Design a protein with these regions (language model features):
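Sequence/structural signature of beta-propeller domains
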Residues: 1-175
Length: 175
């Protein structure tokens, strides 16, 4: 998706126009439309590239920065082999990229024995496993890295009959 912005004198968004909406491309150049391509997470890297996390067949792809984003093939990002053991629809749910390029990946339902959920901090080919414990009955929906190293995690809780709760949790960088 791309569009041009109209901003006011204080740089506040007033309108969007000249929208272009098209499917993202797979590593083969085909549009990503198949149910096995369940894009769940999106983060922008310091170099302007976009990183997309997928469930079902768990993987992360990096797309080049604009203006090439819409027309380029993604490059697979290395992830720990253990991610493939995540539940089909409970894998990579939140991705955040820090200013130094490290990538944080949190899972939605890939549980540890203590009830926390698996996550990883990656730097190139190095993976550091970590645990994330959401608020009671909540699950990770997405996350974002802040410039000073903290992370904001968006959590959601869904109860049948349409009751949805969401919350933001601040995770300090030193934890």
């Amino acid at each position: 998706v791309s569009a041009k912005m109209i901003l006011d004198s204080e740089a506040k968004l007033l309108d969007l126009y000249d929208w272009v909406i098209q499917p993202i491309l797979s590593t083969t150049g085909a549009p990503v439309t198949d149910p096995l391509h369940d894009a769940e997470a999106l983060a922008r890297a310091p170099d302007g590239s976009f990183v997309v996390g997928f469930e079902k067949f768990h993987r992360i792809w990096r797309y080049p920065p604009p203006p090439l984003t819409d027309h380029s093939l993604p490059v697979p990002v290395s992830i720990p082999a253990e991610v493939q053991n995540a539940p089909s629809n409970g894998g990579l749910e939140g991705i955040a990229i820090f200013s130094d390029g490290r990538l944080l990946a949190l899972t939605e339902e890939f549980q540890n024995p203590d009830g926390s959920f698996k996550g990883w901090l990656t730097q190139g080919e190095r993976f550091f496993e970590l645990s994330y414990l959401p608020s009671e009955d909540f699950r990770v929906t997405d996350c974002a890295a802040l410039s000073h190293g903290d992370v904001i995690v968006l959590e959601r809780r869904y109860v049948p009959f349409g009751i949805l709760s969401v919350r933001l949790k601040l995770v300090r960088g030193e934890t």
